[in-house]
């Protein structure tokens, strides 16, 4: 009888520990999620930089198109595997022409976003990549007001002014070091605008795919496969690919496919990090990751930067971090007294409408 009671007690303790994980288990989950986000995000930027600048293939749109192809394949494959074997959960991926047409306006913005992101990375160094696209927050505020009619607090606008100052200082100091590419800066500004528009239009069309971000990812990339074809033709990339001397090189295709896998995984690890922490912590992690990425790039490429160049990076990072903090306070104030379900919904909308980090880093 005593042994039976001890067994029941042990079973109860095991069930309670499973339902209420210890602090250490929670810490492990957070550390693993944040580490995965950093590894895939930083790895994707360096890998794309290599593909865009070091393999002697002048076809940035083709590289982006292929990564979209990998994403579509992975979405369909995981959906079929999930349905057939039930080893994990992944949403169904029905290919519907009606849904594809409804998502098309967003897909046009999506194609512009991933194209300008990669074109910016092609012409600027990894160390300047974050500053080069740092106006996303500013465009997000402007577009939210012009398109949705939503006003932003004076404190948030002050943070945007700080970001603009840091961006201009960064451009100036990049010129001082002799590594400034005006083409790259222009593509960076256009990428920032596209990311802001992408976040807004994502909210508008999300209901068309049943509020499923994975399904939206599949349709966006599926539409992109078609939209990229005339762009590649106009840019003369079919000939560049056909005459590429490493076209049948296994290593090249492994790296290309790995870039697509990393881009796909960014969607998962971003959601995982948010789930393990919070939208605010996710944004702070993204800002810290950008700082680490900048330092790593300077060391990896043996670059020499001025004190003012580093100051520009700090100003942009500080402005972005303060903007996140200010917006979080605004959301907390709005959510005070609201139900937990309403708070969760607000956090989701805030995530979609913020800087679009997930989207811009997934390419």
Swiss-Prot record:
<dbReference type="InterPro" id="IPR050186">
    <property type="entry name" value="TPT_transporter"/>
</dbReference>
<dbReference type="GO" id="GO:0036085">
    <property type="term" value="P:GDP-fucose import into Golgi lumen"/>
</dbReference>
<dbReference type="GO" id="GO:0005794">
    <property type="term" value="C:Golgi apparatus"/>
</dbReference>
<comment type="similarity">
    <text>Belongs to the TPT transporter family. SLC35C subfamily.</text>
</comment>
<dbReference type="GO" id="GO:0005457">
    <property type="term" value="F:GDP-fucose transmembrane transporter activity"/>
</dbReference>
<keyword id="KW-0472">Membrane</keyword>
<protein>
    <recommendedName>
        <fullName>GDP-fucose transporter</fullName>
    </recommendedName>
</protein>
<comment type="function">
    <text>Involved in GDP-fucose import from the cytoplasm into the Golgi lumen.</text>
</comment>
<keyword id="KW-0813">Transport</keyword>
<feature type="transmembrane region" description="Helical">
    <location>
        <begin position="180"/>
        <end position="202"/>
    </location>
</feature>
<dbReference type="GO" id="GO:0000139">
    <property type="term" value="C:Golgi membrane"/>
</dbReference>
<dbReference type="Pfam" id="PF03151">
    <property type="entry name" value="TPT"/>
</dbReference>
<keyword id="KW-1133">Transmembrane helix</keyword>
<feature type="transmembrane region" description="Helical">
    <location>
        <begin position="152"/>
        <end position="171"/>
    </location>
</feature>
<feature type="transmembrane region" description="Helical">
    <location>
        <begin position="62"/>
        <end position="79"/>
    </location>
</feature>
<feature type="transmembrane region" description="Helical">
    <location>
        <begin position="251"/>
        <end position="273"/>
    </location>
</feature>
<dbReference type="GO" id="GO:0015297">
    <property type="term" value="F:antiporter activity"/>
</dbReference>
<dbReference type="InterPro" id="IPR004853">
    <property type="entry name" value="Sugar_P_trans_dom"/>
</dbReference>
<feature type="transmembrane region" description="Helical">
    <location>
        <begin position="222"/>
        <end position="244"/>
    </location>
</feature>
<feature type="transmembrane region" description="Helical">
    <location>
        <begin position="30"/>
        <end position="47"/>
    </location>
</feature>
<feature type="region of interest" description="Disordered">
    <location>
        <begin position="334"/>
        <end position="363"/>
    </location>
</feature>
<keyword id="KW-0762">Sugar transport</keyword>
<feature type="transmembrane region" description="Helical">
    <location>
        <begin position="126"/>
        <end position="148"/>
    </location>
</feature>
<feature type="transmembrane region" description="Helical">
    <location>
        <begin position="307"/>
        <end position="326"/>
    </location>
</feature>
<keyword id="KW-0812">Transmembrane</keyword>
<feature type="compositionally biased region" description="Basic and acidic residues">
    <location>
        <begin position="344"/>
        <end position="353"/>
    </location>
</feature>
<keyword id="KW-0333">Golgi apparatus</keyword>
């Amino acid at each position: 009888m005593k042994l039976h009671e001890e067994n029941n007690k042990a079973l109860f303790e095991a069930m309670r520990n499973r339902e209420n994980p210890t602090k250490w288990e929670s810490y492990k989950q957070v550390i693993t999620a944040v580490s995965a986000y950093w590894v895939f995000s930083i790895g994707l930027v360096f890998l794309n930089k290599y593909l865009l600048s070091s393999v002697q293939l002048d076809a940035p749109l083709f590289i982006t198109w292929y990564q979209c192809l990998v994403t579509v394949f992975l979405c369909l494959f995981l959906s079929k595997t999930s349905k057939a074997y039930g080893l994990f959960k992944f949403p169904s991926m029905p290919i519907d022409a009606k849904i594809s047409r409804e998502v098309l306006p967003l897909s046009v913005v999506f194609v512009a976003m991933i194209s300008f992101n990669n074109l910016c990375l092609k012409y600027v160094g990894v160390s300047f990549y974050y500053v080069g696209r740092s106006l996303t927050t500013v465009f997000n505020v402007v577009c939210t007001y012009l398109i949705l009619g939503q006003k932003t607090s004076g404190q948030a606008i002050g943070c945007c002014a700080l970001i603009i100052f840091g961006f201009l200082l960064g451009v100036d100091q990049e010129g001082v070091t002799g590594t400034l590419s005006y083409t790259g800066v222009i593509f960076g500004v256009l990428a920032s605008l596209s990311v802001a528009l992408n976040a807004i239009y994502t909210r508008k069309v999300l209901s068309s795919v049943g509020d499923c971000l994975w399904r939206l990812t599949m349709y966006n990339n599926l539409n992109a496969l078609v939209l990229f074809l005339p762009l590649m033709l106009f840019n003369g990339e079919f000939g560049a690919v056909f005459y590429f001397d490493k076209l049948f090189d296994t290593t090249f295709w492994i790296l290309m496919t790995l870039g697509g896998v990393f881009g796909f995984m960014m969607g998962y690890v971003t959601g995982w990090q948010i789930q393990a922490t919070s939208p605010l912590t996710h944004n702070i992690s993204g800002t810290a990751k950008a700082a680490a990425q900048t330092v790593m790039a300077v060391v990896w490429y043996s670059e020499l930067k001025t004190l003012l160049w580093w100051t520009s990076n700090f100003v942009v990072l500080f402005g972005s971090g303060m903007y996140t903090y200010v917006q979080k306070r605004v959301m907390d104030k709005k959510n005070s007294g609201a139900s937990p379900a309403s708070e969760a919904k607000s956090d989701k909308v805030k995530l979609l409408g913020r800087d679009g980090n997930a989207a811009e880093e997934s390419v």
